[in-house]
Regions:
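Conserved AMP-binding/adenylate-forming
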Residues: 47, 64-109, 215-216
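Conserved AMP-binding A3 loop
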Residues: 48-51, 164-191, 197
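Conserved ATP-binding loop and adjacent catalytic segment of the adenylate-forming AMP-binding
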Residues: 239-241, 309-364, 368-373, 381-385, ...
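Conserved ATP-binding/catalytic segment of the ANL
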Residues: 376-430, 434
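Conserved C-terminal "lid"/linker of ANL adenylate-forming enzymes
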Residues: 427, 455-458, 487-545
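Conserved AMP-binding/adenylation subdomain of ANL enzymes
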Residues: 187-212, 219-286
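Gly/Ser/Thr-rich phosphate-binding loop
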Residues: 258-263, 271-343, 357, 451
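Conserved AMP-binding/adenylate-forming core of the ANL superfamily
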Residues: 36-72, 83-85, 110-115, 183-184
Length: 625
């Protein structure tokens, strides 16, 4: 074993000579074929994939695609639309080996997303098991392609190894954009990531193929694919999950003895919420008990996470670092502070270790090295072009410089980079002051205790909060409780940051592949479909209180009796299946108990659904009884 700093330095020296995906592929082929490339965690089993099996699959896939795609011209765009899988990268290499450019597609993309992609890339085929509606695209079954019945074809023609991939931005602000990378730019990104990581808190950790890295972000996302390519190059064992659930994440870390993990904020925040629900506190001991003793280093990317998450992990002696990046540039920076305090200062890295040169564009048009404004970046790892109507459009730089505009409002202070918000999300009030919804949202975190989603955006120059909850959880009682929480939080906010209204809805938020709320679409929905939202003005608002404590107490007694639990261990937010571990037999018993005692009719599907808390059931009974 070597230290990360030593091994990463060697990898950087190697990457200095690489300019293509073919270089990368040939390097991987030199790995010990008996080493494990990936462990794959399914619902009830684990599958291991050796390098030998991985490269045999690449050859089989290359022959299969050569037959299936023979009608299309080389250099055409072929998409991969899959959930994370050990053979995701094998599909990518097999397509590149056939001289097809590869587009990484969101497996859960919207109709608008795929319409945009097909129109602007002239996509000819997609490898997937979940086709979207299209008359111009050929769909190739992934399960058929990786079938063990298919064997390598010795008659396969050697073709030029393609050197382009593309990704489509998530449309956070309402607009999609397909960005194209060459292999040279991706190799530079890998080198930059390793250059940052070798100075991180992980620098003295020992590493070899026995060390496991959990790749949890979706691989069509720049954060996910760069993490997979980086750690595959290093030679660790990758770990993936079939399901993108919190339980599968926790299970993979424990069962796989994972040492390193990468995920988006939603996962880390859901984890801390789960721990609080299960252990009734957010402490380092509870986190360690949940994740085991082997986890050492976590990277959070895709969006900004809460300070509470960072603090909890670092207190548990798990180095937790936030990174900043974008589809157009990959991972740009990472907070690599060597102490807990430096990793908890809210920064997402430092300009001196970032992969790109950085400048600040102020609202009055000045370009500064430090200050608050839109971030400008420049570097060799930035995308090469965009796809529009089937043609590649060269990168657009700012005022004929080498810099591009990121659309992100940041502050650079003493070299540290602090992400504030998306420029298009910033609310400029009637006084000309900037209000950042992303920062404001942190104050309303107590709302999450009620199993809801929320976000803040600007309407008519003022901040408003939108709260989404399930139809089963929606009641006058819960609405008034949430309103009271918002009112209490508002009391402690400056006048210009107080939210002026709440919009309640049972509609799920439109989200991106990075699990960010598409605020542009949400605001559009409020304007075009007001019937889907219940507006509560917060000016001179008096809150009516409803009590359902008796019902909650009765339910706690039920679970205490049937599950042999201490009443003190039960609270309103206890998740019945995930935390109290009630099985289908107990849930059926609960169904009968409620109907008989409260003389109400309820849908059985409601009782059997996951993520149902004692409070959810109590609210349902309160509404119907």
């Amino acid at each position: 074993m070597e230290t990360c700093k030593t091994l990463f330095s060697k990898c950087i020296n190697t990457l200095n000579n690489y300019t293509s995906f073919e270089d990368y592929y040939d390097y991987l082929k030199n790995q010990d074929e008996t080493n494990t490339f990936c462990e794959y965690y399914l619902r009830d089993k684990k599958e291991s994939y050796l390098y030998k099996e991985f490269f045999e699959k690449v050859e089989t896939l290359a022959a299969f695609f050569q037959r299936e795609l023979s009608e299309f011209a080389e250099n055409s765009w072929v998409g991969i639309k899959l959930t994370n899988h050990p053979y995701y990268l094998a599909v990518c290499f097999a397509l590149l080996k056939n001289n097809f450019n590869v587009m990484l597609l969101d497996n859960n993309g919207s109709t608008d997303y795929f319409d945009y992609v097909v129109k602007n890339s002239k996509l000819v085929a997609v490898v997937t098991d979940a086709p979207f509606e299209s008359n111009s695209v050929k769909f190739i079954s992934f399960q058929t392609a990786i079938s063990p019945k298919l064997i390598p074809d010795e008659n396969i023609k050697n073709k030029k190894f393609a050197n382009k991939i593309s990704l489509c931005t998530s449309g956070t602000t309402g607009y999609f954009n397909i960005v194209v990378y060459s292999g040279e730019q991706i190799m530079y990104q890998l080198k930059s990531v390793l250059s940052i990581l070798k100075e991180s808190p992980a620098q003295d950790m020992l590493i070899d193929n026995s060390v496991k890295f959990l790749v949890y972000p979706p691989l069509h996302h720049i954060f996910g694919i760069i993490m997979l390519l980086t750690y595959s190059f290093v030679g660790v064992t990758n770990v993936m999950c079939e399901k993108t659930t919190l339980s599968s994440f926790i299970n993979a870390i424990n069962e796989g003895n994972v040492a390193w993990a990468a995920a988006v904020p939603l996962i880390w925040e859901a984890l801390t919420k789960f721990i609080k629900g299960k252990y009734k506190s957010e402490n380092a001991e509870a986190l360690r008990e949940t994740l085991g003793e082997n986890l050492k280093f976590c990277i959070c990317g895709g969006a900004h996470t809460s300070p509470e998450v960072i603090k909890l992990f670092n207190k548990a002696k798990i180095a937790f670092s936030e990174c900043y990046g974008m589809t157009e540039a990959g991972m740009v920076s990472l907070n690599i502070g060597q102490t807990e305090e430096s990793r908890m200062n809210g920064s997402v890295g430092n300009v001196h270790t970032a992969s790109c040169a950085m400048k600040i564009l102020t609202t009055d048009g000045k370009i500064l090295n430090e200050g608050i404004g839109e971030l400008l970046i420049s570097g060799n790892g930035i995308y090469a072009s965009t796809l529009k109507n089937g043609k590649e459009i060269p990168i657009e730089t700012f005022e004929n410089s080498n810099f591009i505009k990121t659309g992100d409002l940041v502050e650079i202070k003493n070299g540290n980079i602090y992400f504030r918000d998306r420029i298009k999300d910033v609310i400029i009030n009637s006084s000309g002051e900037n209000v950042c919804p992303g920062e404001l949202e942190k104050y309303f975190a107590p709302l999450l205790e009620n199993n809801v989603q929320y976000t803040i955006l600007g309407i008519n120059y003022f901040p408003v909060i939108i709260i989404s909850l399930s139809e089963e959880n929606f009641s006058e009682g819960i609405k008034e409780l949430l309103t009271q929480k918002v009112v209490e939080t508002n009391k402690n906010l400056p006048l210009n940051k107080k939210v002026v209204a709440i919009y309640f809805t049972t509609k799920p938020f439109p989200i991106t592949s990075a699990l960010k709320v598409r605020k542009f679409r949400l605001k559009q929905s409020i304007e075009e479909q007001p019937q889907n939202y219940v507006k509560v003005e917060l000016i001179n608002k008096t809150v009516k209180k409803f009590s359902i404590e008796e019902i909650k107490s009765d339910l706690k007694t039920f679970f205490s009796t049937y599950l042999n639990l201490n009443m003190l261990d039960l609270n309103d937010g206890s998740l019945i299946i995930e935390e109290l571990t009630a099985d289908s037999l107990i849930m059926a018993e609960l169904f009968i108990y409620i109907e008989e005692k409260y003389q109400i009719n309820i849908e059985q599907e409601f009782i059997l659904k996951n993520s149902l808390s004692i409070a959810n059931v109590a609210n349902m009974i309160f509404e119907k009884a």
